[in-house]
Swiss-Prot record:
InterPro entries: Orthopox_35kDa, Pox_vCCI-like_sf
Organism: Vaccinia virus (strain Copenhagen) (VACV)
Cellular component GO terms, alphabetical: extracellular region
Primary localization: secreted
Transmembrane segments: none
Top-rank taxon, per record: Viruses
Family: Belongs to the orthopoxvirus OPG170 family.
Induction info: Expressed in the early phase of the viral replicative cycle.
Residue positions with a glycan: N70
Protein name: Protein OPG170
High-level lineage: Viruses, Varidnaviria, Bamfordvirae, Nucleocytoviricota, Pokkesviricetes
């Protein structure tokens, strides 16, 4: 009994030390660790189908299929990867969340050089494509392949990169909102953090917080 207690007490300091060492990745002088979150809200022109959620994460992108809609996101010149995909559905609307994880919790991590970071701020494109997975011969078919035109586009400060979002939708999508956030994953640990970049696209009057409040289930 005493031997077991001794072993447990000896292990406690090492367990705390492991967590601390993991976060020490933020002390690197020649690398930056950036995270990304992409939220998409898409409203279809008919009630969603009852389907099983399927997702795929690949290098510099990810996709999710649910309710008769496929949402794919590709990151061009961003040097970032997604680690999780979440989805939430309600009547005729699909909500999707694509996100990375902190560098001390997963592999491979989103690390980049200072030169990569400069290129990210100047050239990063978040390419979002909404593809309908329903029969195009049905009566509710609309203008096939047309690009939605935003009635309200906003670039949220302090982003100075202009529009990072390029979005194309298929015929069954009535409205879509997309929100992108690129942030310093070590911002709460380092003395000086990199400013967060945000972009927001919508075809209707709304605010990003309407998407952010949704509860997402892992897919």
């Amino acid at each position: 009994m005493y031997s077991l207690l001794f072993i447990i007490l000896m292990c406690i300091p090492f367990s705390f030390q492991t967590v601390y060492d993991d976060k020490s990745v933020c002390d690197s002088d020649n690398k930056e660790y950036m995270g990304i979150e992409v939220y998409v809200e898409a409203t279809l022109d008919e009630p969603l189908r009852q389907t099983t959620c399927e997702s795929e994460i690949h290098k510099y992108g990810a996709s999710v299929s649910n309710g008769g809609l496929n949402i794919s996101v590709d990151l061009l010149n961003c040097f970032l990867n997604f680690h999780t995909v979440g989805v939430y559905t309600n009547r005729d609307t699909v909500y999707a969340k694509f996100a990375s994880l902190d560098p001390w919790t997963t592999e491979p991590i989103n690390s980049m050089t200072h030169d990569d970071l400069v290129k990210l701020t100047e050239e990063c494109i978040v390419d979002i494509y909404l593809k309908c997975e329903v029969d195009k011969t049905k009566d509710f078919m609309k203008t096939n392949g047309n690009r939605l035109k935003p009635r309200d586009f906003k670039t949220v400060p302090p982003s100075d990169v202009g529009s990072m979002i390029e979005l194309q939708s298929d015929y069954c999508v009535n409205d879509v909102t997309a929100y992108v956030k690129i942030y310093d994953e070590c911002g709460n640990i380092k003395q000086h953090s990199i400013p967060t970049l945000r972009d927001y696209f919508t075809t209707k009057n709304g605010q990003p917080r309407k998407i952010l409040k949704k509860k997402f289930d892992n897919c």
